[in-house]
Amino acid sequence: LGEDYAMRLNRDAQVNVLDAALPLLGAGSRIVFVTSHQAHFIETVPTMPEYEAVARSKRAGEDALRARIPELDAVGVGFVVVSGDMIEGTITATLLERVNPGAIASRREAAGKLYNVAEFAAEVARAAVDDIPADHTRYVGDVDDFTRKG
């Protein structure tokens, strides 16, 4: 897959999809970019070493798409980032738990609750139709642990 696989997937592919889709999107359309709190806050809050490369690549994708907001606004296309905490039942959480036993329980304790896949999917769907927050970011799950450190 190559050393730069995460960056190609989480930044370059996202930009390529936007480039291909934008001419087809009409005013009132919306781009929803899904990321993790660990990636969204990676510049100010360290994450597990096992996830750092992925987190940095996802943040690079977020930044690349955010840089396009003026262009999207000009054609009436909305943009929102959905930043979610660790999601129980995903392969990412399962793999992180394998290399860092206790990671899920630790994050659940810090956050008070972790969303499952269905709950998180419902939040992503809401982001596609709800008003766009002023900062273009919808947080799903607790962020206190990230903003206190940031």
Which residues does each predicted region cover?
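Aromatic/hydrophobic pocket-lining residues that form the small-molecule binding cavity
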Residues: 14
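Short active-site-adjacent structural elements
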Residues: 89-92, 147-148
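Short secondary-structure boundary micro-motifs
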Residues: 6-7, 39, 96, 112-114
